Amino acid sequence: MLSSLYRTRITHLSRTPVHHYFEQGGYSWYVDVDELPRLPRWLEPFARFEAVDHLSPPTAGPDTLRARVDHYLADRGVDLPGGTVTALLQARVLGYVFNPLSIFWCHDRHGTLRHVIAEVHSTSGDRHAYLLPPTGAQPAAVKKALFVSPTDETDGYYLVRAPLPDAELAVTISLHRENKPAFVATLDGTRRKASIANVLRLQLVAPLAPLVGAMWIRLQGVTLWTQRAPAVREAPIPEREKVGQL
């Protein structure tokens, strides 16, 4: 599979504890974890992929992104030998990376999509991966487990719709409490070839995208605080990489 890029638009809508909306442009890589992009040396600082940025390391063998995905699945009783794993994620830019959401689509050896891993990262450095069934028209439900905001508890459950991307990317995640949506996020994008020209172009239209994305999310937290959103006193410590289930 040839790697590709998605020029993306992210939207966040909070309905409680205060009403707040923002959107941000950026881009994401779509890759085969067994065939990560190889760029010219002079371009590598703007697109470097590191296994350490995702999931947990394997207990034995080389520490690669594929090994981390296999380890995560095996730890949950899932064995997909020989199957393709594609991922939507951010690459390191000048050594920095921030992945609010990384998604892995895990296929069996016959090419059938069997599982989806959605890994959420917080600006404080915590992360938690959720194992989901394939999602199409119907979203998958999973309990929220990671503390991602000083104004938001870990109660409630997510509805996640993450169909396998094609020419268009369309991911939706909504947080529900008392059967009502408290928060809705979308990630939409249009597919582009991962050419040198497109990589360079995206550095101009979305420079330092991972750093800007992290700063933008922190700024939204400050905005919520100025709107008198109540702060959560103690952040629950997540069980890293534990699968969430209803």
Name each model-derived stretch.
Residues M1-L246:
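Mature, function-bearing regions of proteins
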